[in-house]
Regions:
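N-terminal organellar transit peptides
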Residues: 1-22, 28-123
């Protein structure tokens, strides 16, 4: 995610059929006008998950890191979609699947394309 924003070359993200979980976070690194998908693409947003093991203190540390990651991801989704943070937090509480059309409405992508020729020259 940070590397996509760090490089100077313009990056266009194209959803090829399925953009889910951590891939959605990477997808949001590109500016909205450079986020597109194909018609049958499905998107999945949700809170992070993880496993923990070891001593109780280690488990508590890992749980806190997952909570921090959840907030960081929610803030990123809110910033990139324009959705209120409370709405995003509710949306990622469980798996939330979106069709290509729903992804446009949600603000994950700018538009749906069917052919490479539909990419703008500026993209």
């Amino acid at each position: 995610h940070d590397v996509v924003r760090f490089i100077s070359a313009p990056v266009t993200m194209i959803g090829p059929g399925w953009v889910g979980s951590a891939a959605t976070h990477l997808f949001l690194a590109a500016p909205r006008e450079r986020r597109v998908c194909l018609p049958n693409t499905r998107f999945l947003i949700h809170q992070p998950s993880g496993g923990a093991g070891g001593q109780a203190t280690d488990i508590a540390i890992q749980a806190q890191e997952i909570i921090k990651a959840r907030l960081r991801i929610a803030h990123e989704i809110a910033r990139e979609t324009g959705k209120p943070i409370d709405e995003v937090m509710a949306d990622i509480e469980r798996d939330r699947w979106l069709s290509a059309e729903e992804a446009v409405e949600y603000g994950l992508i700018s538009r749906i394309i069917e052919r490479k020729t539909e990419l703008r020259k500026a993209d």
